[in-house]
């Protein structure tokens, strides 16, 4: 894996201690709700089999792995950015903020943070800066990122299920807030409410129309 070709001495220390946090996000594309991120530090003495990119796992498998990760990980934390923050900052910067919150909230301070994707924000924990690397498709390559992907995905899906119970006419349980035909039809008929991202073009167009 390419990430291991650019390790610094500080990174090597991090690997030797095992304090590596994997970070991933879910929910950049939906029209509604928070963007959700997770940071996970796995226990090398309690390996978890079957970890992978959450999008490649069935809902049943994700739920089972979610419980196992919560039980076996040294620590994990969920970070998020609200629709209001997304509208203020834009989705990219809001996602970076949510990732920073996830890492800052860990009970243990990682020495290295591995982030899925092609960019990584500045991370700190208790005012101490942390080395980080971004890894393209890391959620299918690095166990801790896979675990973070699963924690974030299950968390956000459950929130969409709760939103579906409160607003059944929108069909959130099926489309999870993503811009599908059924979702567009629902907001055209019923309008939008506070948890919608008003800066996103389809929502903005409806509000301005």
Curated annotation (Swiss-Prot):
EC number(s) stated in the UniProt entry for this protein: 3.1.26.4
Alphabetical UniProt keywords: Cytoplasm, Endonuclease, Hydrolase, Manganese, Metal-binding, Nuclease
InterPro entries: RNase_HII, RNase_HII/HIII, RNase_HII/HIII_dom, RNaseH-like_sf, RNaseH_sf
Protein name per its UniProtKB record: Ribonuclease HII
Native source organism of the sequence: Shewanella sp. (strain W3-18-1)
PROSITE patterns, per database record: RNASE_H_2
Domain RNase H type-2: 18-209
GO biological process, one term: DNA replication, removal of RNA primer
Similarity comment: Belongs to the RNase HII family.
Residues annotated for a divalent metal cation binding in this entry: 24-25, 116
Main location: cytoplasm
Pfam family, one: RNase_HII
Record localization: Cytoplasm
Cofactor(s) listed in the protein's UniProt record: Mn(2+); Mg(2+)
First-level EC class: hydrolase
Keyword Transcription regulation recorded: no
The protein's role, per its UniProt record: Endonuclease that specifically degrades the RNA of RNA-DNA hybrids.
Cofactor binding remark: Manganese or magnesium. Binds 1 divalent metal ion per monomer in the absence of substrate. May bind a second metal ion after substrate binding.
Gene: rnhB
Catalytic activity line of the entry: Endonucleolytic cleavage to 5'-phosphomonoester
GO cellular component: cytoplasm; ribonuclease H2 complex
